[in-house]
UniProtKB/Swiss-Prot annotation:
Pathway: Amino-acid degradation; L-leucine degradation; (S)-3-hydroxy-3-methylglutaryl-CoA from 3-isovaleryl-CoA: step 3/3. It comes from the Eukaryota. GO terms for biological process: fatty acid beta-oxidation; L-leucine catabolic process. Keywords: Acetylation, Branched-chain amino acid catabolism, Disease variant, Lyase, Mitochondrion, RNA-binding, Transit peptide. Catalyzes the fifth step in the leucine degradation pathway, the reversible hydration of 3-methylglutaconyl-CoA (3-MG-CoA) to 3-hydroxy-3-methylglutaryl-CoA (HMG-CoA). Can catalyze the reverse reaction but at a much lower rate in vitro. HMG-CoA is then quickly degraded by another enzyme (such as HMG-CoA lyase) to give acetyl-CoA and acetoacetate. Residues 105-119 are annotated as: RNA-binding. This is Methylglutaconyl-CoA hydratase, mitochondrial. PANTHER family: ENOYL-COA HYDRATASE-RELATED (PTHR11941), METHYLGLUTACONYL-COA HYDRATASE, MITOCHONDRIAL (PTHR11941:SF12). Changing K105N: Abolishes RNA-binding. It comes from Homo sapiens. The gene is AUH. It is linked to 3-methylglutaconic aciduria 1: An inborn error of leucine metabolism. It leads to an autosomal recessive syndrome with variable clinical phenotype, ranging from delayed speech development to severe psychomotor retardation, coma, failure to thrive, metabolic acidosis and dystonia. The modification N6-acetyllysine is found at K100, K113, K144, K204, K211.
Length: 339
């Protein structure tokens, strides 16, 4: 089968070396021995949060993004491993209230550290990214911090942001962005890196970088077209338009839209419900399904089917597959161990 996969057609363009190494490592961890078509070796695993008073999309200006990088930096990212019936679900809670959860150097460092730990933890089944600050998911870059950077510092820092967002996109388990508030610029790019996005109807989302005479630098120019189509993505980026939750659902940017509740966490609760739906499924199957979808979306159908075949082969020798068959025969819930 490996020979058949290697022979599958579908030439691809070159990819940034760092991204290629990242995906190669991810693929090796998910599917040891998996051989993708030669032109796909190291291919990027493609993808594929509420605020009141913000101006809606119809002709209105983008919300202002004034915030500070001052005050304390500890506890800006809270990593919670849920227990009991939610065991296996990890929640990354962004908690930088004084900076509207903007992407500072410290927050990027903390995100990178958390993602590095999670990607190799086989007890993790699903990851939810949310805000612990009412009304905000992530307001994008910390502009006050950015204003203090020299021109020579900006590029490398944006590259760090892009790398962390790519790491999130390449996590081996399902990821869900719970958008209960404002998600602008890098905040929306962070959400776009997740497998599934859910939002409150009052949430505001947009790639507004062109208002600052720059472009999205955290993957937005690539992931937004893949999510909603090229023409509409161009329109939204060119206009710096901001969408509310219902508008985002209508264009396919998010999967679910909820009316906000009194607690302000409607999207998070929906994300938690989805994560609970994922928990009973076979862990190995979930990982290789994500890999097959992500890799297959980047290539032609014939090559994608070869990728699916190679990924399916990884599930055949697993103990979980045998457990699934036995549980079906015995008419009981399966007890999967990720083996």
């Amino acid at each position: 089968m490996a020979a058949a996969v290697a022979a599958a057609p579908g030439a691809l363009g070159s990819l940034h070396a760092g991204g290629a190494r990242l995906v190669a490592a991810c693929s090796a961890w998910l599917c040891p021995g998996l051989r993708l078509p030669g032109s796909l070796a190291g291919r990027r695993a493609g993808p594929a949060i509420w605020a009141q008073g913000w101006v809606p999309a119809a002709g209105g200006p983008a919300p202002k993004r004034g915030y500070s990088s001052e005050m304390k930096t500890e506890d800006e990212l809270r990593v919670r491993h849920l227990e009991e019936e939610n065991r296996g679900i990890v929640v990354l809670g962004i908690n930088r209230a004084y900076g509207k959860n903007s992407l500072s150097k410290n927050l990027i460092k903390m995100l990178s550290k958390a993602v590095d730990a999670l990607k190799s933890d086989k007890k993790v089944r699903t990851i939810i990214i949310r805000s612990e600050v009412p009304g905000i998911f992530c307001a994008g870059a910390d502009l006050k911090e950015r204003a203090k950077m020299s021109s020579s510092e900006v590029g490398p820092f944006v590259s760090k942001i892009r790398a962390v967002i790519n790491d999130i996109a390449n996590l081996p388990v399902p990821t869900i962005a719970a958008i209960d508030g404002l998600a602008l610029g890098g905040g929306l790019e962070l959400a776009l890196a997740c497998d599934i996005r859910v939002a409150a109807s009052s949430a505001k989302m947009g790639l507004v970088e062109t208002k600052l005479a720059i472009i999205p630098g955290g993957g937005g120019t690539q992931r937004l077209p893949r999510a909603i189509g090229m023409s509409l993505a161009k329109e939204l980026i060119f206009s710096a338009r901001v969408l509310d939750g219902k508008e985002a659902k209508a264009v396919g940017l998010i999967s679910h839209v909820l009316e906000q509740n009194q607690e302000g966490d409607a999207a998070y609760r929906k994300a938690l419900d989805l994560a609970r739906e994922f928990l009973p499924q076979g862990p190995v199957a979930m990982r290789v399904a994500k890999l097959a979808i992500n890799q297959g979306m980047e290539v032609d159908l014939v090559t994608g089917l070869a990728i699916e075949e190679a990924c399916y082969a990884q599930t055949i020798p697993t103990k979980d597959r045998l457990e699934g068959l036995l549980a079906f025969k015995e008419k009981r819930p399966p007890r999967y161990k990720g083996e």
